[in-house]
């Protein structure tokens, strides 16, 4: 413990010299130049004018020259030390900043003012304006009609076009209804096979811009007529319902008697009586149940 305290007592804290190494080298170079100029002036002033040379003068001149050489050598030593210190500090600073990576500074490139250079950027195509009006010509209509009526065009996918092949026939065209509004441009009535059934189909070509409410209503009515058939219910009175039941029973019993007589010729003849609804007593209905919902096709 005493040794540690003794070692701490030896430590002396001194402020570091933050001056740059370049300033120190410049100051030392200026001091050397000043010392050399002072020595030259002193030599010029101390020289006598044409005295006779003697041993004392030679000895004094040699002594002065020795002094100057010693001073110059000291200055050179000081310069070398300062250069070494500045170089070591510079290396340490660069090593700490770049972490041991040595990089070479390249000179800046000269800018080339070439205004006729072609731009290398990829130019975007100009957006096409959407057409608000549909251009309908006779040629375009014929091409559309050819696509729908030709059987040779097989390159179209089912999502783009219908997969029904249609064949024109004059007989179906004569029996078709004439709808001038729906078939304003061109129409053809075809016989189409769909799920094993032959259906009549009219194809119309229009520009797609002119839409009429009457035309849409007619199309909806046609769709309901073909695909939306239902049994229509009709109200009838109870007496009419009883009469229809009696007729149906009588016809059924007579058909049964004829079948038995023709089928068994050797059978024993048994007296048969025809039974009617008058013999059957139906319960009396109240006034609230006078009418009943019955299908119109029941006869």
From Swiss-Prot:
Function noted in UniProt: Potential cofactor involved in sensory organ development. Despite its interaction with the Polycomb group protein Asx, it does not regulate the expression of homeotic genes.
GO molecular function (one): DNA binding
Residues found modified as Phosphoserine: 204, 264
Tissue distribution: Ubiquitously expressed in precellularized embryos. Then it decreases at cellular blastoderm to increase again during germ band extension. During germ band extension, it is highly expressed in somatic and visceral mesoderm. Ubiquitously expressed in imaginal disks. In ovary, it is expressed from stage 10.
Region: Disordered, residue numbers: 16-100
Cross-referenced InterPro entries: Tantalus-like
Top-level lineage group: Eukaryota
Ranges annotated as biased composition (Acidic residues): 53-69
Residue ranges, compositional bias (Low complexity): 84-93
Ranges of compositional bias, category Polar residues: 20-35
Quaternary state and interactors: Binds to DNA in vitro. Interacts directly with Asx.
GO biological process: sensory organ development
Alphabetically ordered keywords of this record: Chromosome, Cytoplasm, Developmental protein, DNA-binding, Nucleus, Phosphoprotein
Pfam families assigned: Tantalus
GO cellular component, one term: chromosome
Subcellular location: Nucleus; Cytoplasm; Chromosome
Protein name, UniProt field: Protein tantalus
Classification of source organism: Eukaryota, Metazoa, Ecdysozoa, Arthropoda, Hexapoda
């Amino acid at each position: 413990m005493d040794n540690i305290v003794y070692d701490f007592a030896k430590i002396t804290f001194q402020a570091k010299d933050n001056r740059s190494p370049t300033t120190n080298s410049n100051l030392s170079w200026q001091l050397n130049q000043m010392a050399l100029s002072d020595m030259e002036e002193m030599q010029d002033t101390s020289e006598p004018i044409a005295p006779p040379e003697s041993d004392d003068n030679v000895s004094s001149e040699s002594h002065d020259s020795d002094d100057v050489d010693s001073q110059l050598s000291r200055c050179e030593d000081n310069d070398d030390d300062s250069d070494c210190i500045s170089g070591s500090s510079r290396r340490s600073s660069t090593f700490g900043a770049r972490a041991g990576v040595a990089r070479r500074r390249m000179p800046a490139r000269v800018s080339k003012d070439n205004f006729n250079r072609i731009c290398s950027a990829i130019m975007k195509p100009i957006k096409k304006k959407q057409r608000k009006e549909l251009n309908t010509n006779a040629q375009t209509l014929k091409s559309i009609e050819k696509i729908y009526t030709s059987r040779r065009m097989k390159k179209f996918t089912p999502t783009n076009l219908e997969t029904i092949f249609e064949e024109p026939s004059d007989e179906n065209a004569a029996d078709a209804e004439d709808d001038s509004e729906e078939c304003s441009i061109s129409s053809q009535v075809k016989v189409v096979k769909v799920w094993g059934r032959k259906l009549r189909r009219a194809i119309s070509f229009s520009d797609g811009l002119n839409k009429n409410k009457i035309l849409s209503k007619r199309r909806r009515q046609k769709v309901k007529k073909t695909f939306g058939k239902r049994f229509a219910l009709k109200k009838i009175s109870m007496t009419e319902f009883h009469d229809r039941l009696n007729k149906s029973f009588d016809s059924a019993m007579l058909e049964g008697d004829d079948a038995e007589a023709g089928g068994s010729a050797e059978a024993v003849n048994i007296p048969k009586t025809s039974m009617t609804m008058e013999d059957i007593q139906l319960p009396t209905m109240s006034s609230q149940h006078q009418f009943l919902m019955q299908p119109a096709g029941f006869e």
